[in-house]
Amino acid sequence: MAQSKHGLTKEMTMKYRMEGCVDGHKFVITGEGIGYPFKGKQAINLCVVEGGPLPFAEDILSAAFNYGNRVFTEYPQDIVDYFKNSCPAGYTWDRSFLFEDGAVCICNADITVSVEENCMYHESKFYGVNFPADGPVMKKMTDNWEPSCEKIIPVPKQGILKGDVSMYLLLKDGGRLRCQFDTVYKAKSVPRKMPDWHFIQHKLTREDRSDAKNQKWHLTEHAIASGSALP
């Protein structure tokens, strides 16, 4: 399959590993999937290999896996694609999650491309505290994230991008739980060109695929970058 100058192909495999701890409960999750960098689509299968079953809603982790890899975003030609341009060396990100019920999470990830394997590796660490025992996350009353739009803000002097988005967890009772995401994306190599500010719309979808032995789920994402629709 033909590669771009960044070691990316039209279709790539992905391997994920997350180590985490939420309110004292430690866990390890691994996953594999297929992604289409230039179509902005990806799909992964995840499995809790240590610490399962999780005593909280796995939806809080979804944004660290799929929304966690911005290489799989469809970019128009008139916007510089910072994420693909960072490959094959890749990039890192650090993110804070502030939930409206008082819970706080932090996550960081390291993303690299193996040109030889045509594979993208995603290693992350996730920590969460202060989830109310009677809240929707600990009671597992969530049902995916509502589609969202992240504003991407360049910081040229530092060679980084900042991401700002309020996302909403859909609840099984019909309600919503708001979470503020603040992210810093940093390429491992010095960016040759920085993008202007822009938006990334993304939709995450989780499907439970657990069996008698392991907690498993399937995640898909579609992400598209754009400028303002207003002059």
UniProtKB/Swiss-Prot annotation:
There is a cross-link at residues 66-68 (5-imidazolinone (Asn-Gly)). Pfam families: GFP (PF01353). Pigment protein that is yellow-green in color. The modification 2,3-didehydrotyrosine is found at residue 67. This is GFP-like fluorescent chromoprotein FP506. GO terms for biological process: bioluminescence. InterPro entries: GFP, GFP-related. Tentacle and oral disk. It comes from Zoanthus sp. (Green polyp). Contains a chromophore consisting of modified amino acid residues. The chromophore is formed by autocatalytic backbone condensation between Xaa-N and Gly-(N+2), and oxidation of Tyr-(N+1) to didehydrotyrosine. Maturation of the chromophore requires nothing other than molecular oxygen. The precise stereochemistry of the tyrosine has not been determined. Belongs to the GFP family. Keywords: Chromophore, Luminescence, Photoprotein.
